[in-house]
Structures are given as C-alpha cells and as structure tokens.
Amino acid sequence: MKQYLDLCQRIVDEGTWIENERTGKRCLTVINADLTYDVENGVFPLVTTRKSFWKAAVAEMIGYIRGYDSAEDFRKIGTKTWDANANLNDAWLNNPHRKGDDDMGRVYGVQGRSWAKPNGEFVDQLKKIIDDLSQGIDDRGEILNFYNPGEFDMGCLRPCMYSHHFSLLGDTLYLNSTQRSCDVPLGLNFNMVQVYFLLAIVAQITGHKAGKAYHKIVNAHIYEDQLELMQSVQLKREPLQAPIFKINPEIKSLEDLETWVTMDDFEVIGYESHEAIKYPFSV
C-alpha cells in the first residue's frame, strides 16, 4: 500500500503535464515506476484508501486467460470493464474490423491464446508457458505477450499491461509484468491485484511456490480531472491493514480455469477500506 501512495505522491510532486491526444485531456505524468508484490507471504496489494473492487480485476484476468474477445463474456464472469471500450469508442465503432455490439477485436487474451502466424496458424502462448512450467522447464522465454503492432487496427484498444514474464528458480515461480501506460487513480489498484493474482494462480496450477511479482509501469499518470480528488481526498487518508486473498485449492490446471472456475472460487478476507472515490474515466 505504501508503494502505491508513494507513486501517487510522486506524480503530484514531480509530474509533467502532457496533452493526451486520444482523450483530449492533460495528464500529470512521470516515467518509470517499479512496484513489488510479496505473493509468497500473502501480502495482497488491495488499495484501502478507497474502496476497491477486486472481483472485477480477477474476473478480467480470467477473461484474458480464456482468450475472450467480447465484453458480454467479461460481463458474464463478473466485470463490466470492457463495455465502454467495446461500445463507446468512436474510432472502434467506425472500424471495419468490428463485428458488432460488445466486440473487442484482437486484444489482450486473444493475442495470448491465438497469436496469428503468417501461414494462417496460431500460437497459444499461455498453454506453452503452462506446459513448460508444469514440467519444471524455464527456457528464459516464458513470456505472455499481448502487444502485437501488426493487429492494433483489429482491436478496440492497445494493451496497457502487455507483457508477463515468468521465471522459475528451483521450485519458486516469479513474475515480471510490464505496463506501457497506467491511469493511476483508476487503473493501478486494478492492475496490482491482477499481477498478484496471475503469479498466484499460475504457481498453483503448475505446482510451484509463488515468489515475488515485479510490476514495471513506464508512463504513470493522473488525468487533470482526477487530480483534485487524489490530492484532497485519497492522499489525505491513512492506509488500513492489508487483507488476505484465498484461491480454491481444487483449481489445478489451465483447463479448470478455462471451464468451471467462477468468482466463487476466490475470496478476500479481512478487507476494510475508506469510502469509494468516483474518479472520472477517460475512454
């Protein structure tokens, strides 16, 4: 929690105002932020200085694991995070690749599960990683990559957190996640949960202990219409004790995650927070 608040304060104190062409708004911006999550000791990085909705974050990552390309599928597993980008983004609404309501195109999990090859075949990056790690193999390239410039025009949004690199040292699994851009007030509490969850669940289904997850953010920013709430409300609050995150131990394989797993298989114990803050969202 401290590293989250430290980053927020750093942006306020040291950030540079940058015009964002996509949203038409200014952002207070810093370059390079590194956060570390102690998954091994169960230090769950859920923000307590405002109410945070961890279920939507986990549900979204499960949708990526399943390779979903429809906002409707994400809603069914418990998150509405893709509704706006799939249905309210003018550039995407006028894109000939869009298939209709709720279509997201070839983004995130689609790239992770079916990266297109020139010969018409597809690469399932995630399955390769899970298969390797389950056999104790780390080829120094166990990388789940969502960033495919050749297909940016075929999706509603470029990936923000685009790379997840797993590393095995003995029986302990580590994760390095890289994010090109982060809306810190709205998105970071979400992304912290996702990085923690991804290492925890992959360690479980591959039979390893979870170590630490390292989260690099390149462009960390606060939009101009979020700054007052961050300065006068969230940064004035004292953080509360971190909760505990539990995963159903019966989840033992990638197939389990693809088929029967629901949000009922995850639990957060002892979460207390300050009141919610309604930060503006920029499509």
Curated annotation (Swiss-Prot):
GO biological process, one term: methylation
Recorded GO MF terms: thymidylate synthase activity
Catalytic residues as annotated in Swiss-Prot or TrEMBL: 160
Pathway: Pyrimidine metabolism; dTTP biosynthesis
Binding site for dUMP: 22, 180-183, 191, 221-223
Disulphide bridges, residue numbers: none
Protein name: Thymidylate synthase
